[in-house]
Amino acid sequence: MSKLKIDGKEITARRGETVLEVCQREGIYIPTLCYQKNLTPYGGCRLCIVEVKGWSMPAASCTLPVEDGMVIKTNTPKLKKLRKFSLQLILSEHPHSCLICEKEEECAQYQECIQKSAITFGCKFCSQNNNCELQKLVSYFGVREIPFIFNYRHLGIERFDPFFDRDYNICILCGRCVRVCGEIRGAHVLDFHHRGPDTLVGTSFDLPHLETGCQFCGACVDVCPTGALHQRYGKWEGEVQKSVTSTCILCSIGCSIKLNVCNNKVVSSTPNNNQICVRGRFGIAPLIHHPKRITAPMIKRNGRMVQVSWEEALNCAVSKFNEHRGKIGILFSNQLTTEAIDSTYNFANNLKCNNITASLEMKNNFKPYDCKKIKGDSVFIFINTNMIENYSPLFLKLKSKRNVNLVVIDSLKNRFSEVADFWLRPKPGKEIDVLKLLFARKKMSNTTGVSYNTIKLTTRLLSGKKTYLFCNPNNIDNIHVPKRVRLIPLYSQINALKILNAGVGCSLADLLNNNKIDCLYLIGSAPKLSRDYKTIIVQDNFPPLFEFDVFLPTATFTETKGTYINIEGKKKILQKAIDPPGKSKPDDWIIAEMSKILKFGMNPSKQKYRKIVRRGALKKRSLTRKYPHFLIVRENCYSYRGLILSLVMKGFKRLKYDNYIWIAPDVAKKLNIKNGMELKIQGQNIDITMPAYISDTVPENCVFAYSHLSMGINTSQPVRLERAEEGRKKE
């Protein structure tokens, strides 16, 4: 502990603290611009300078460690003058006409008609107006003139990447984006280019972010103090009127987020003192306000879907249920609230319907694990799981543990395999055999495609260290590990553990292949249907690809209250941020209203459904002359209520390519396949057509696809490829 005096106040500071940190803790205000909590101090803006007794020059408090006996002054006339001078220097390369204008308040009424200008000349042209740290500092220092010639950089605005724009004409070179990208996210996409007055922030060789490994997490946007980096969606919606703390449900982690609202519209979603991923940062607002969303009840009348009142729609649905009693199938999404899931189970029980299951078919049942209990000095093994793409917030927490090693077992090459200490690339379907070799007590034959030397080196790494094995249970079958290895399941969707504990009446395949079912009730799910049904009732936000008889529009997770169970078995709270648009209603409200009409009680269901148990290994299918290529299928974690995000948002389409069949270069060369060509993929239980995307991430003689419930893609298997009659170039 150190004792020092700041502005005449005796203060005790902890060892390693900086003067700025001590002042912030004690409530002593020091202006900053380049400083950001949890990032390495930069000392670039010089606004946080302080005077230290005995020192000839002021020092930047953000980089100044405390020392015993220090006497510091933070607010002298000399410091005020120097800070104001530094701010004026910064403003000499930043459009400042509005910042120093005496009539700035008078022109506020004209802001809306000029703010969408292509070039930002002043605050009224900037999307960050009234939310800019520079504006606050100019007001604090009372800056009314800039004694330097204005230097405008004349840089083009970068709009060629998805999700956010970059206008480096208003960048102040604070370095926050560079540091957060490297230090917190570990992506190292951004850095400073050139020197002196030519210094700029950018990517290596000025490549687009899509080509540099950018995670599009938005961390750089969140720390930017000006409008240099700004989210594209909602950019001109206006100032945020309220921020509601809630939970992101677009994956199983359940990150805490802030839903920022303006005029009953979510304009953005931002982290709540944590890190989130591209789905939570840029996927929520455009998804829930998408123009294709249906917000009014509809029924089929004379072969056409027409809008009706809730009373008519509910009565129509109830009449269908009564008509098909005993022949009803219910398929619901894991992404319903736990309250809506309970209501669904109770509704099925009252209907005496045992044909009920969840859209995410969980093939293995493992116990949850609190990731806070994971210790350092360990080895983390990840099998068939891309943590950077699918679980980046969790991966950042794991990576922060002290002295850990990463081992990736995956036949696919990706960003995550490239950052691992060891990447074991087996033949597709041989991942379990690699695990057996790693933990074998005696020598075994090796047919995995991974060299004995790599196995040996990895085994040495595991020796004497605590080992954790992470896997998505739906990407691997029949997994067994020694007792000393802790297996941690990474289910892709929230509430997976809720479904596992509650059980289901049947499997997804049994439900869809049951010819006795005449009425299908789909709650947030739209699978590929292999046959016709007499009645299909859809309860969702978006219409399915097939015809239906009744549509009941539901509220999204931003428009209702509730709870969810995350990947660790913890309850996550959902808060209502906005009112549902149109006539949309929460799922549990819809089910409750139909139960009233049917005179059902709403007491908890006593029906006991079968627990989901581990399934045995799939029968291995060898390549044949008829099916010469192996299709690798991995679960698509970028979906909401069965809807693939790339189908409704262009940014995700450019980022994921999950509506393409990925082709290994050797297969493309052999079959003369070009990017964008329509290919027919046929196997024992698959027959689809998709455009081609050639990628070296796919191993030889293989193709790869993300799982698609709506297309029936869910199992890795041997396939054959045929070029469709018409081809089109990849967008």
Go through each PLM region and give its residues.
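A cross-kingdom feature strongest in bacterial/archaeal respiratory oxidoreductases
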Residues: I30, Y35-Q36, Y345, Y369, ...
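Short, glycine-/polar-rich solvent-exposed loops and beta-turns at beta-strand/coil boundaries
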Residues: Y35-Y42, L64-P65, R195, N675, ...
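A generic structural motif
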Residues: E104, C353-K363, L406-L412, K483-K498, ...
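Short acidic (Asp/Glu) and glycine-rich catalytic loops that position anionic groups and cofactors
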Residues: T63-D68, P197-L200, A296, N414-A420, ...
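Phosphate/pyrophosphate-binding active-site segments
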Residues: I432-F470
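Short acidic beta-strand-loop surface patches of small beta-rich interaction domains
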Residues: T40-G44, V50-W55
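A glycine-rich, hydrophobic/aromatic-adjacent loop/helix-cap motif
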Residues: L462-N513
